[in-house]
Design a protein with these regions (language model features):
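Core catalytic alpha/beta fold that binds nucleotide/phospho-ligands
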Residues: 1-152
Length: 152
């Protein structure tokens, strides 16, 4: 998966959902307190693992957009996935950022993969987001059903 942006920072991360499931032990290392509470409220281990992978993928996209690598403490980024389609983000003061500065999308490009995209926002501008399947110099087509969640 590749992201293209004109004049804006962009980060993209893709994870294979068929890998061994993520665990709560793993969550203790990179999740915020709020995220851990959300994970614990999930009764089903499969749902916990799925949500944990959502958090990881979104955080990786953000870190890539910021171009600071893992020097950003991931447990200081707090994500919430309200309803069935929303994404909200908040940052601890040590991250020196604000959730309104970023737009997020989650996608399901295939049955075995989930992806996240993070793009810097500018006040007073609207972001256009499109997903395409492409084989360079051969074909490309829009994909509309891949987007599963987005920030407002």
């Amino acid at each position: 998966m590749m992201g293209v942006s004109r004049h804006r920072a962009i980060g993209v991360d893709t994870e294979n959902v068929t890998r061994s499931p993520a665990s709560m032990e793993m969550a203790e290392h990179f999740c915020s307190r709020n995220e851990i509470a959300q994970l614990r409220s999930e009764l089903d281990e499969n749902r916990q693992s799925e949500r944990l992978l959502d958090f990881w993928t979104l955080k990786e996209a953000y870190v890539k957009a910021r171009r600071m690598g893992l020097s950003i403490p991931l447990n200081q980024i707090s994500l919430s996935l309200p309803g069935s389609r929303g994404i909200e983000v908040a940052f601890d003061g040590s991250v020196h950022d604000h959730g309104d500065n970023w737009a997020f999308w989650m996608l399901r490009p295939s049955a075995d993969h989930k992806s996240a995209v993070c793009v810097a926002r500018s006040p007073g501008t609207t972001l256009a987001f499109a997903v395409r399947s492409a084989i360079p110099l051969v074909m490309h087509q829009m994909i509309t059903s891949a987007i599963t969640r987005k920030s407002e």
